[in-house]
Amino acid sequence: MKAANCLYKYIWLAMTLFPLANVGLFICNGNFTFTVYGWYFILQQLAICMVVALAEELFFRGLLIREMVFGFEIRPMIASVVVSIAFGVMHLLNVNSYATWNYAILQSICAFAVSINLSAIFIKSKSLLWCVAVHGLINMTSVGLEFNNERFVLGNIEYVIFLLVSFIYLIYGVKMLNDDVMEGR
């Protein structure tokens, strides 16, 4: 029960920080054009976000972290960093589809930090449910930000916001990995 209480103590940040940053930038940008796409498109994008989150979490947390930490008994911090580097590098591939190099690098840094956090959540809970929920929520708000406004361009302040949020995620994930629940590992 102590592990569950400790997990819930931390989960609120993972569930809210990046989505709130995305929604805040979305609102500050001032263009609410959901009607341009229609509800079918919006629901389709939300479903895609959840399927992508599920697939990535099954691979990175459900397979890699599970095998490294619980199978090969690699220290959680080392396993989390290795998997998070791979997760961040994978997001660099977005430069081939829609992103500029600056945005792809920013997204990779954010993905690394979020991955540390998601890895800690998975190690503590031994469940992918929270990881998929957090990842899906981040994906949904990110896609909403990208699709809602074709004029949306990240300026210096947006880069600083995303880097600050990434830093908070990173620190929070490291704290979870080093928390008293992890001492037995």
For every predicted segment, state its role:
Residues M1-A53, V143-R185:
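Specific transmembrane helices
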Residues F18-P19, S84-F87, G136-N139:
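Residue-level recognition of pore/gate-forming positions within transmembrane alpha-helices
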Residues C49-A55, G88, Q107-F112:
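Residue-level hotspots within the lipid-embedded alpha helices of multi-pass solute transporters
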Residues G88-V95, N117, L170:
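Transmembrane alpha-helical segments that form the membrane-embedded catalytic/substrate-channel core
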